[in-house]
């Protein structure tokens, strides 16, 4: 049975931050300069782990504001802030134009179709010359999964005989595409940084039952199928992984990507 949004937000706090988000935020820590910032906005901050880490690292005079994706995530983030006595300001408000000299956007868990919308929002709230960093997944990710999903969908005569898997592949933007998007909405001096992150599971069952895959990735990829067909595909995918990899672990890779630029 599909989980409620509140249940998903709880799982996201427990598992996704460590298993997924940290692999992306490492790019911010390595390549995004916040040393001269006076105020920072973190868009899609999740339950706040990286925002708290930035608070510890930056001068106490730097104001850190963070927006959350929904009310339940906001509640978790605020509870954490209270427990840690952190002054990171979590909210879901719409900030004024040109209010921040640094903006971070975590689009790593956002549908690719919303990428431009999030970059536009970052540009709107940034002052002229502000540094903007956007985290996302780019083309070449999940290839090991998509090829197996295509085979399962084709064999089971689902998803228009594998067409759904082909759409999963083509939906992910290339580096050129996200650079073009950034320049189109007003960023200059655009650069990208990519880390090839590998996720490993003992076998097919461990893969399809992991919270990242079972509760977040597969439901999005198989959204066009009814619940019964989704379960059938999941079971067949697990079996196919084991038949192909034998006693070896199953791995898939993700192109964790940071795009940086300055508002012109």
Model-derived segments and spans:
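Class I SAM-dependent methyltransferase SAM/SAH-binding core
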Residues: 39-95, 117
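Core SAM-dependent methyltransferase catalytic element
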Residues: 186, 208-214, 254-264
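A short acidic, Gly/Pro-enriched loop at the edge of an enzyme's catalytic core
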Residues: 93-103
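A short SAM/SAH-binding and catalytic strip from SAM-dependent methyltransferases
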Residues: 101-116, 136-138
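C-terminal helical/coil "lid" or tail adjacent to the Rossmann-like core of SAM-dependent
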Residues: 191-246
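Conserved catalytic/acceptor-binding region of the Class I
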Residues: 116, 131-202
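Conserved SAM-binding loop and adjacent beta-strand
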Residues: 11-29
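Short glycine-dipeptide loop
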Residues: 60, 126-132
